[in-house]
Amino acid sequence: MALIKCKECGESISSSAKTCPHCGFKNEITTCPECGKKIKGTETTCPECGYPLQKKNANNIVAENLDKITGAKSESYVTFKDLFKNTFKKHTEEELDEVFVCGSDKTTPKVKDINPKDASAWVYLKIFIFFLLAYIPTRIGYINYGNDNFLPGLIMLGAFAMPVTVLIFFYEINIFRNIPFYKVLKYFILGGALSLILAILFFSLDFNTDISTYSGALMVGVVEEIPKATIVALFLFRNKKCNYILDGLLVGAAVGAGFAAFETAGYILRNGISGGISTMLYVVKLRGFLAPGGHVAWAAIEGAALMFVKGFEPLDKKHLNDKRFLLMCLIPIVLHGVWDMPITLPFYGLQIILTILAWLVIIYYINLGLKQIDDAKKFESK
């Protein structure tokens, strides 16, 4: 790794160092230490000679491999940490209200006024707390006082808490702010129900969906992801305001969240009937814990992939046959299939690993979506 001089103190530092270890100055590389080409601070390798400007991490490795599939030249606009930088900051009620006021001609910002570095989320945590505060008394009412009237509330709150929380995260990250919240709810409720019905129709066909076998588990991934991708595509085709990758992430997440919430409610009820209260409560906790890496993430990838291959063209049927879209849709299918396979690791290690992989893909698409903002500004200026 080459050495460069710190602009602040003049000491020699590694070219990959983000801050000077001597004086703490934030180091922004403007030229490649190897060939001297001018570069952006967001690039991980020199576009001219390929010299590594940053140490490779999981994000870089995933991005490089996904670039080979998509043909994109991704850039790191934000890290996973950046997306949550405002979570624990103090916010006013007015700021909270403004988050949900968007989607109309008056409340949708012009692309030239959007700063991709502003992408962050914080309302999702408040939503999760609301669910938690509502879940506790329903649980007490049913478990401690034996009042069956609390059971429907316990099931619905337990099933909806995490999928809705993750959905709100995607809603906040869509800084185009061009999809009103009522439409997000529409995609969540209708999309979840329609994709479930479509999946049931697929299950009624003569497929091997026995998750005790590897082939059966993989087929479950096919049978459940194709219906979700179909409904996501339907909504994206119908909503002419959806033009960007971040829109695809949001619409996909909404459909996936609806699918996850309704499916989880069914699992909670079924396990409660067959296994009793303790089993039911275990399912609530387990499904909630694993929700961020499941249906919400998988459907979000499908939506983002479709909007990526569209680029700045009007969405067309030809994009559904685009090789890049089809290859990217294999990712959630494989992730889902492996998730259901009879592979046991301690502490649900397999599902945690798959969650991390899914979110590395999502971060990749978030960065492509933020890069698209700069690309859109150039496109509009032509």
Where are these regions (language model features)?
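Hydrophobic alpha-helical segments at protein termini of multi-pass membrane proteins
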Residues: 45-382
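Cys/His-rich metal-coordination motifs, chiefly Zn-binding "fingers/knuckles"
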Residues: 1-64
